Amino acid sequence: MVVFLGRHLPALLEVFKKGSAKAESDNRQGAGPSQGPGSVGDELQDNVFFPSGRPPHLEELHTQAQEGLRSLQHQERQKLSKGGWDHGDTQSIQSSQTGPDEDTISIYSQKSYMTESSTAEDALSVRSEMIQRRGSTFRPHDSFPKSGKSGRRRRERRSTVLGLPQHVQKELGLRNNREAPGTPQPPGSRDAVRIPTVDGRPGLALGTGVRVSLQALEAETEAGTDAEAVIQRHIDRVYHDDTLVGRSTGARPPPLTRPMSLAVPGLTGGAGSPEPLSPAMSISPQATYLSKLIPHAVLPPTVDVVALGRSSLRTLSRCSLLSASPASVRSLGRFSSASSPRPRSRNASSSSDNWSHSQSSETIVSDGSTLSSKGGSEGQPEGSVASNNVAPPPPGGSGRGSPSGGSTAETSDTASIRSSGQLSGRSVSLRKMKRPPPPPRRTYSLHQRGSAVPDGPLGLPPKPERKQQPQLPRPPTAGGSSGVGAVSCPPSSAGTWGSGLSPGGSRRPPRSPERTLSPSSGYSSQSGTPTLPPKGLAVAPASPGKAQPPKPDRVTSLRSPGASVSSSLTSLCSSSSDPTPLDRSGPQMSTPLSDRFVIPPHPKVPAPFSPPPSKSKSSNQAAPVLAAPAVAPGQVSTIDTSPASPSMPQTTLTPAQESPVASKDESPPPSPPPSYHPPPPPTKKPEVLEEAPPPPEAAVEILPDPSWPPPPPPAPEEQDLSMADFPPPEEVFFNAGPELGPLESCSSEAAVPPAASLSQTPPPAPPPSSGSEPLARLPQKDSVGKHSGAPREDSGTPLVTPSLLQMVRLRSVGASTGIPNPSPGSSAPQKPLRRALSGRASPVTAPSSGLHAAVRLKASSLAASESPASALPTGIPEAEPRSPQSPASKASFIFSKGTKKLQLERPVSPEAQADLQRNLVAELRSISEHRPPPQAQKKPSKAPPPVARKPSVGVPPPSPSLPRTESLTAPSTNGLPHAEDRTNGELAENGGVQLAATEKMGSPGSDPQKKLV
């Protein structure tokens, strides 16, 4: 029946077509007259499955489908009735086992079967061909093509089986029954597809073959030969003639001449060793890629061959990379680091290995990227230095800037590593990623590294340091360099850094300047754009003890924590911990330990008189945090100024950090804050005036700023103060201290050293400063206490905060304008912090930073000169000292832009500043309560750097003090009304705090600040 239909299909189809056409024509004729145009719609509506209503194309489809079904059924019946296929399968299977001719046999059997099948299914095949020729959309499964396909498939399968690797056959006991074991046949000798053994020799009983067999190597190694030497010899032997690698077809080259594949190094060449010797599995890095033999491939120097023995695991060969590309070094480092403890002989390995010491090979990967971005030499020095000591990295100083890829890049890596803890170095891409994250991460890494000043940048030094002393260095970086980041966490870290950091700090400063640019990584630039200035600024801050200031350059972005290096960092730190801002303004996070140690090295001449112990006291709180010794003095006066302002902005941060401060300062500060807090908004301006005296102090200090070198002596004071050695002033300090403490707790690590510098610088001013500062401090402490004790109250100071915030921003924009104004005092302290924190933010330090630095220096100098004359200037001098720390100062400006600040900054006339400062002093004395305004100012400080704001918790603390300092200075310079003066005073008092406050409360002063900008 099927055959009949198949043979007569064409006629049948024609009949169907004719019938359907007739039916359709009749249908149309019948419906046409009545339905007219609607006939087409009716046709479409017809039941397609009703035979009479089907259009011809549908009919054809149905016919084809039926044919396909019939052909399938026919096939099934044939299979059941005939043994042809089964017979063929059996034959082919048998042949596959029979021998070399199996393929031919199977082909024959299939061919014979196909002929039968084709004759039997001739009709079907013809019919299916016909249908296909017609190009129908439906092609029935025609049995012939199907059978052919299946046959082909089986053949292919058989061929694959024929190719079973000989070692597999041996293991399965399928050893060639068909061929004598000793007589290998050339691959082309038979039709069957044979997969030649990888090494190109016949699969004899040698135990060689596809299996990666390092028997020869093992034998030699066991014999006592140096594994490395053996491997090298073997590789040389294998690759002496790479041209033959590809010749697997045709006459096979003599086994000895044909080089072995990398994956299967012809280590089996000496194959005689008994099977047990061969490793259960041996893995080589290239094995993955060696599925095919690559004609001219050479074993890369970085490849390690590891043999997993049945009983042991050992690295058979480790290539030494004497000269390898960064990538290869990277991979090599990875393998070497992971595989073997002993360092690679390659040169690059020095840096890679250093990394690898503390980190896994992954670090090496990062290192590889570092090498490429860093340039091997720089990355290496950094790595080596880091390895040797965090301190040594000075060579990386420039490298740091550029090492953003390497050291700096590593810093990114480091930052990321630091962030992840001691993660292995991340790759360059990560580094890139890191920079944007830096603000937050910076805060994090800074906090982490608060103690590790050396890593001025977030993780820059740390990475090497991490290698060397991953954990200690890192905290130090946070504390000393990244005071900001460290601020919150770093107290302990910072302490550690003190010892470990000092080297890092010193090394950091050198790089900091350059780094500043690189560090900005966007953030640093943001903070002051003093990327470049940071260097100069860093120099001035460094003198006070700001090894960090130099760091700022790189740190600026990474290290912004330290010197408000990056406004974002400031933001982060400040949001992270209010105390940080204080520290920043006073200590200029960067300076903490770094400053301490590095200040002497490259002290910026402008080291005003270190603030009196009062600063120290402020610093006391900070000192406990991390770099109390260095930071305390500066921080006390600067922070005092800064804290008050910052305390409010930092309320969020301060509370947590303030607790520490409070514990240090005790509840006194908290209580005072409430009393003062109520007046914050109104008092803010009065407070500014009130605090103006502290700003003069700052100014005095700042004036000496040029002689930052003097700060070293103050540092002791600062330490004492930090140590809370000044119980008498403690009350005042406690008031301001709580804020200071909180700020310093976060920022103390990073900022305390800067503060110390400031305090050291302003020693002359201390007396007046002490007198006024205590008052200012009280307000500050109130502010701080409010922050810590009554942060909410400080929050109440939002008025100041918004303006201060805006002011801070304006300041950052108009750092130059702000610098002169800040010089009166409030600005100066903040500026120093900022400068220290961000090398680029050293606008206050005219020498180091660009216009901002120059303006700020001018302002600070003016303020300093006035300050020395009167206590009022003292506050400014303090600010000014920060100015010298222009990195921080600039950051301070940026962050502590306060409306008041702006206004003050605008009137840069020294006289106006002096008057304002005097007013501020008077107000501070009379209105020490009005610390809340300082807090508000502190918030404005935070606000300036948008990025900083993001991390407002973490960044503002470090930056706020600087911003405050700047704010204070700016107000004095601007000669704004008492409101501005107050802002300045607050800034001076609150220093770091003011940053946060200014940022937060910058709204009032935002306009002025903007104008400045």
Curated annotation (Swiss-Prot):
Alphabetized PANTHER family for the sequence: NANCE-HORAN SYNDROME PROTEIN, SIMILAR TO MKIAA1522 PROTEIN
Compositional bias annotation for Low complexity: 336-361, 484-493, 515-530, 564-577, 615-633, 859-873
Compositionally biased tracts (Basic and acidic residues): 73-89, 168-178, 779-795
Region (Disordered): 20-195, 330-1013
Function: Able to directly activate the TNF-NFkappaB signaling pathway.
Name of the encoding gene: Nhsl3
Residue spans of biased composition, Polar residues class: 90-99, 106-120, 362-375, 408-427, 635-657, 814-829, 964-975
Organism: Mus musculus
InterPro entries: NHS-like
Protein name listed in UniProt: NHS-like protein 3
Coiled coil: none
Keyword vocabulary terms for this entry: Methylation, Phosphoprotein
Asymmetric dimethylarginine found at: R318
Highest taxon listed in the record's lineage: Eukaryota
Positions carrying Phosphothreonine: T160, T529, T591
Modified residue annotations for Phosphoserine: 92, 136, 143, 159, 213, 320, 325, 328, 336-337, 339-340, 398, 402, 407, 543, 610, 667, 671, 838, 842, 848, 909, 952, 959
Location of Phosphotyrosine modifications: Y108
Compositional bias segments (type: Pro residues): 600-614, 668-683, 706-716, 942-961
